[in-house]
Amino acid sequence: MPEDEQRSSLRGWLSRVRASFKGAGDVVETGGRGEGAVHLSKALPRFFAAMQTRPAPVLLDLGPVIGGNVTLLGDSLGCKVYIDNIFGDPRRASHDRRETEDCSGLGVDLRHPDDSIDGVLCWDVFEHLSQAAATKLVLNLARIMKPGGIGMAIFATELAPHPQFVKYSMIDPQHLRHRLVPAAAAQPRVWTSRDVQLLLTSFVADESYLLTHQQRETLFHKPVAAGHRPRA
């Protein structure tokens, strides 16, 4: 399928799944970016809906292990989840290690087979990487994701007031709770909309949502080459 048709098809699919998870239940949203803040996600329900169209999808979570997330993903999607926490313990991740152009100390190599991952969750990742490390991570994502695979990334649009990482706990397929973890060094950068576009040149950016709590959620997919047939 030509890329323009593929992109149009995926956008049409995204519009059809907007109501896939109706009703917020008893979840109460809170404002701000403080500890325990709860926010409605625009991209997460679309990511869930995308994975529900795939039999036994394989997911990669680039954040720390959060038992509730693994349980919700497994129960909702019947999927296999790999956890690659590329920073390890953020309280020990040094500023020099994250800012250096040498990526050898980071887990950005992603030791997974080519074309093996259906979906990727990129939580509090890119804000803490140098340009070189972020680029290397994206290239490795392009290698390991299946053609048509879907990714969700969150980017902060302003610097955090204190050195911290954010753990994202999924309350349901619509809501995320923010858990703040002290970090060894301050967040070195933010990514503008233009920065994100340039970073994801290996992918097709499908939708981007600028949220009121100074975050941008982005959905992207790996292009499907002409004549490509999914593996059995």
List each model region and its residues.
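Hydrophobic beta-strand segment of the Class I
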Residues: 120-121
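Hydrophobic adenine-recognition pocket in adenosine-nucleotide-binding enzymes
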Residues: 125
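A short His-aromatic
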Residues: 128, 133
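A short glycine-rich, Lys/Arg-flanked "PGG" loop and its adjoining helix->strand segment in the class I
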Residues: 135-147
